[in-house]
């Protein structure tokens, strides 16, 4: 997406500052909304006597600024203790900064070198258990890592590979001029990715198959699906809506799930269905937040920050 939107603008002289301000306008409004919605839970922790009040207050301040919370006493602490999902946003912003710093100098050969380097680092570090890979394998899979301080290095490699692989996929998509993908191919690619994410690989093959999926299967599947042009109508509208809501769903999922869980406890409901109920609630919250908060706030920020670009 960023490659499509900004490559030509970098060639025309777009500055790093202007690019990063644009990314701030895109990412911060819904992140800030998630933080504000989580405040009742956080203040409740303080009122109830949080075990480490100073650390909780530090977390509040850092979270408000979209920064990770330092916690040298606990290496397994989350970078974003109040919105777990925000860890990848931090790494994405870092990747965005590198992307902007390289700007028009980032030719395709350089992208291939970056993707190859990160892929090699991913294979070696995941195999050897370096930089935090494997520490959270029971919770987040053999390639999990990045949300906590002890797996920070794994996050750098994961996001570095995925970000620049996305840039490379787009450049291939743009220059190869491949024919449009048939619906059957696109559906098969989507089904394959879904199956890989849903199923557990045998433990003896888990690492190898996970690496193959991430480095080979997923980029190919994305390339195929990108070549699929859905027919106009309800299906195309649904795809557009899902794309519109994707960021809101991601950044608001944690606080919304907490709210649904709190309601379930208050109503003394104990059922696995609570999780299923939370899914449409998250989608509805993301839709309302995108339409009524994100879009107008971004327009306001664009006007307010115009002089700084």
What residues fall within each predicted segment?
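Structural signal for the C-terminal ends of transmembrane alpha-helices
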Residues: 2-10, 40-44, 101-108, 167-177, ...
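Membrane-interface helix-loop-helix regions
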Residues: 3-5, 13, 17, 21, ...
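Transmembrane alpha-helical segments and their boundary/interface "anchor" motifs
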Residues: 7-44, 54-63, 95-96, 154, ...
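Membrane-helix interface segments
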Residues: 11-16, 56-57, 107-113, 178-184, ...
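Hydrophobic alpha-helical transmembrane segments
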Residues: 20, 28, 90, 111-116, ...
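Function-critical hydrophobic alpha-helical transmembrane segments in multi-pass membrane proteins
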Residues: 78-103, 155, 159-164
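Solvent-exposed interhelical
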Residues: 93-130, 170-186
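Alpha-helical transmembrane segments of multi-pass integral membrane proteins
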Residues: 123, 155, 163, 190-296
């Amino acid at each position: 997406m960023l490659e499509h939107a900004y490559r030509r603008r970098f060639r025309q002289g777009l500055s790093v500052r202007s690019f990063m301000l644009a990314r701030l306008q895109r990412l911060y409004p819904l992140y800030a909304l998630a933080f504000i919605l989580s405040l009742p839970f956080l203040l409740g922790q303080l009122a109830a006597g949080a075990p480490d009040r100073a650390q909780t207050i530090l977390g509040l301040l850092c979270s408000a600024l979209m920064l990770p919370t330092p916690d040298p006493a606990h290496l397994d602490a989350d970078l974003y203790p109040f919105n777990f999902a925000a860890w990848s946003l931090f790494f994405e912003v870092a990747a965005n900064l590198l992307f902007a710093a390289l700007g028009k100098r980032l030719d395709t050969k350089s992208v291939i070198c970056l993707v190859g380097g990160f892929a090699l680092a991913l294979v070696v570090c995941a195999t050897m258990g370096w930089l935090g890979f494997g520490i959270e394998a029971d919770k987040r899979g053999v390639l999990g890592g990045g949300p906590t301080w002890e797996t920070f290095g794994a996050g750098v490699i994961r996001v570095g590979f995925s970000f620049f692989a996305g840039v490379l996929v787009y450049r291939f998509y743009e220059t190869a001029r491949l024919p449009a993908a048939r619906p059957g191919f696109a559906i098969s690619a989507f089904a394959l990715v879904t199956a890989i994410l849903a199923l557990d690989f045998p433990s003896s093959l888990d690492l190898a198959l996970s690496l193959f999926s991430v480095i080979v299967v997923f980029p190919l599947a994305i390339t195929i699906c990108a070549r699929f042009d859905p027919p106009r109508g309800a299906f195309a509208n649904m795809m557009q809506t899902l794309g519109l809501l994707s960021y809101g769903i991601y950044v608001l999922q944690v606080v919304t799930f907490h709210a649904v869980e709190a309601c379930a406890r208050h109503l003394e409901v104990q059922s696995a269905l609570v999780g299923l109920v939370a899914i449409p609630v998250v989608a509805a919250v993301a839709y309302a937040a995108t339409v009524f908060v994100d879009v107008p706030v971004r327009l306001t920020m664009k006007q307010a920050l115009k002089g700084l670009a």
